[in-house]
From Swiss-Prot:
Gene: CFAP53
Origin species: Bos taurus (Bovine)
UniProt cross-references to Pfam families, sorted A to Z: TPH
Tissue: Expressed in trachea multiciliated cells.
Keyword Lipid metabolism in record: no
Key words, A-Z: Cell projection, Cilium, Cilium biogenesis/degradation, Coiled coil, Cytoplasm, Cytoskeleton, Developmental protein, Differentiation, Flagellum, Spermatogenesis
Protein name: Cilia- and flagella-associated protein 53
């Protein structure tokens, strides 16, 4: 147990002197059987506790199910009782309403019989009344039928009358034209407003640009003044340093005169002092230069910080897209470079536009030449086709003329032969005509009488037809007049109901004409 908790532990421990060993005591032996028995008892206790918990849960579940079953039975019985009461009440109310209705019908029937007895209406009067009622119903139905027929005829007239449809189409087209004019005016107004807004924005942009240029000029003047003041201060410092140097130089010259009058040892000492002084002066000069450089750097740093602060303030105030650099000179160079690039871009753009225009002109010329070539080709083909057609027509005409000449020659021969046969026949008929002359004269007189009778009958029929045509013409004029009156009446009472309203009219109903 001990070894399991602390690992393997050496029992022998070396002492303070050689061959001196200390032995650790053995740990007490664990009572394994008791621990095992305790574990078994603990597991049995846990098992019995789990069984008891399961039994308790099962008992609670059965109890809950029993309670739910009882609640469901109670609710079902309660619902059935309430439904039964409601049905009985409904049946009772229905019976009461039926009884009341029976009593009301009986009372109305009694009143009707009483009224009939008071009126003492006879069968003839009743028949007359029924006939009048039937006549009125027939007249009403006939009127409804006539109205329906008139409505359908009017509808058929509206659908089939081309003149009415043309008039309605003209009215609709006129309304559409008016709406289109109003829409065009509305679009022109929108364009004008857009132009005004663009002019206003360009004016504001120009004012903003001028204000920015004024601020930049003011800032540039302020920077120049600051640089000038700094330069003057630095010049004053340099002048003071030069004065100090001149004073030191004069002191050095005086010391040199004193050193020349001394002996060699003093001269050596003076030389050493001189070297020390020169070193000191160099250190002073280096310190002064370093201080001057640090001051210049500090002023430049302050200037840069001030420039950065001004840049941040300008960016926050104007929301500008350009970032200014720490020095105005660099900014001017950038502006010049950008302007130069912009001019180069404009020149390049101009050259590209010129090249595009030249290319477009070349393409147009090429297209024009191509079209002219195609047109010349079409004209040439058309001319050749016309010439070929003319040749074919001339050939056909020539053949027709030849055929006609041949046919005429043949007909002339046939006529000559026919004339000869006719002459022979005439000679034969002359004798027959002399014999039949008297008979033909009598037949001619009879035929003349029949012709006169036919002419009279035809003249009478013609007069009757003319009279009939006149009556039909007058009826047609009357029908045309009624037709035009009907069209005008429909047009005067016609009211166009737009089924498909234009989106512009729907969106701007107050601005467009009705």
């Amino acid at each position: 147990m001990y070894s399991q908790r602390f690992g393997i532990v050496q029992r022998e421990v070396k002492g303070p002197t050689p061959k001196v060993v200390i032995v650790r005591a053995k740990p007490p032996k664990g009572q394994g059987a008791e621990h095992h028995l305790q574990r078994i008892q603990h597991s049995h206790q846990k098992h019995h506790a789990i069984l008891a918990s399961i039994k308790s849960i099962e008992r609670d579940r059965l109890k809950t199910e029993w309670d739910q079953h009882n609640d469901c039975k109670f609710v079902d019985s309660l619902v059935k009782a309430r439904v039964k009461d409601a049905m009985q009440g409904f049946i009772i109310n229905t019976e009461e309403r039926r009884n009341k209705l029976r009593e009301l019908l009986a009372s109305e029937e009694n009143e009707y019989f009483t009224e009939m007895q008071l009126k003492e209406e006879t069968i003839e009067e009743k028949k007359d009344r029924m006939r009048d009622k039937i006549r009125l119903l027939r007249e009403k139905k006939e009127k409804e039928r006539q109205d329906f027929v008139a409505e359908k005829l009017d509808q058929q007239f509206r659908e089939r009358c081309q003149e009415l449809r043309a008039e309605l189409f003209c009215i609709h087209q006129k309304a559409v034209c008016e709406e289109r004019k109003a829409q065009i005016a509305f679009n022109e107004e929108l364009k004008r407003q857009k132009v005004v807004e663009e002019q206003m924005f360009s004016k504001l942009w120009e004012e903003d640009r001028l204000a920015k240029e004024r601020r930049e000029a003011k800032e540039e003047r302020r920077q120049k003044e600051l640089v000038e003041n700094t330069r003057l201060g630095l010049n004053a410092q340099v002048t003071s340093i030069q004065a100090q140097r001149q004073a030191a130089q004069r002191l050095k010259e005086e010391e040199a005169l004193l050193v020349e009058n001394e002996n060699a040892q003093v001269k050596l000492e003076n030389e050493q002092d001189k070297l020390k002084k020169q070193k000191t002066k160099q250190e002073i000069r280096a310190a002064l230069q370093k201080a001057l450089q640090e001051k210049m750097e500090r002023m430049q740093q302050e200037y840069r910080e001030e420039q950065d602060l001004n840049m941040k303030l300008m960016q926050n105030a104007l929301q500008s897209l350009q970032e200014e650099t720490d020095k105005k000179k660099q900014k001017k160079e950038d502006m010049r470079r950008e302007q130069k690039i912009y001019y180069q871009y404009l020149a390049q753009r101009h050259e590209e536009e010129k090249a595009q225009e030249k290319e477009l002109d070349r393409m147009l010329e090429k297209e024009k030449e191509k079209k002219f070539a195609e047109k010349d080709k079409e004209l040439r083909l058309e001319k050749e086709a016309r010439k070929q057609l003319l040749n074919e027509v001339m050939c056909t005409r020539k053949l027709q003329v030849q055929e006609k000449l041949q046919r005429k020659a043949k007909e002339q021969e046939e006529r000559t032969m026919e004339q000869e046969r006719i002459n022979e026949g005439l000679k034969e008929l002359n004798c027959e005509e002399r014999e039949n002359f008297i008979r033909r004269c009598s037949l001619a007189q009879e035929y003349r009488k029949q012709l006169q009778m036919q002419i009279c009958s035809q003249q009478q029929a013609r007069e009757a037809e003319e009279e009939e045509e006149r009556r039909e013409f007058e009826a047609g004029i009357a029908a045309e007049k009624s037709f035009q009156d009907k069209i005008q009446g429909i047009l005067s009472t016609h009211q166009v109901v737009p089924r498909n309203i234009h989106p512009m009219r729907r969106a701007c109903s107050t601005k467009l004409p009705p």
